[in-house]
Amino acid sequence: MEIRVYDKNLIFLGVVEDFKSLIWTRKYYEPGNFELHAAGTDKNIQLLQAGNIITKRGAKEAGIIGAYTDQEGSNTNQIVRKGNFLGSYMSRRILHYTHNFSGTYEDGMRYLQQNVEAIPLLELGEKCGDTTQVCFQTTWKNCGTMLTKLAKSSGLG
């Protein structure tokens, strides 16, 4: 398995060398998370900085490096990086003011994403065609929390 690293502008930085384990946790209704244990080489330390993005070759998901620790000792020279999948960017956005919506769940989710501070390079995929209707009002809420609530109540992942 190849772990590729990009900066926040999606410029390819390199490939992680000699990693011990990768826990890649997918979640259906909300962004997943990961934990990477790798050799503490100079190259890995340089690549695996907070804010950089990792992905498995061929995977649809990618994660943002958040917390990390370096473990050095006579028996170990290992780095640990943890983070959340890119969907977690929505949890960094607040829905300012009052928003009223009536339509399909899918259109409601898209509406919320379009009414927060723009996320550079964000592109929404094709519509899935869900026709289930919803009405909601939100004021000063976390966008990620609202998207998770809509996903759970509609069954859309």
What feature does the model see in each segment?
Residues 54-84:
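Short beta-strand and beta-hairpin "edge-sheet" elements
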Residues 84-157:
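Charged- and aromatic-enriched interaction segments used to assemble
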Residues 44-56:
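Short coil-to-beta transition motif at edge beta-strands of beta-rich domains
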Residues 32, 79, 154:
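Residues that flank catalytic or metal-binding motifs in active/ligand-binding sites
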Residues 41, 69-70, 155-156:
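Short beta-turn/strand-loop junction motif enriched in small, turn-promoting residues
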Residues 1-47, 82-88:
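Juxtamembrane "anchor/assembly" segments of surface/extracellular structural proteins
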Residues 44-46, 63-64, 73-75, 89-92:
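Short active-site-adjacent helix-start/loop capping segments
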Residues 23-24, 67-72, 136:
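Catalytic micro-motifs at enzyme active sites that drive phosphoryl/nucleotidyl and oxygen chemistry
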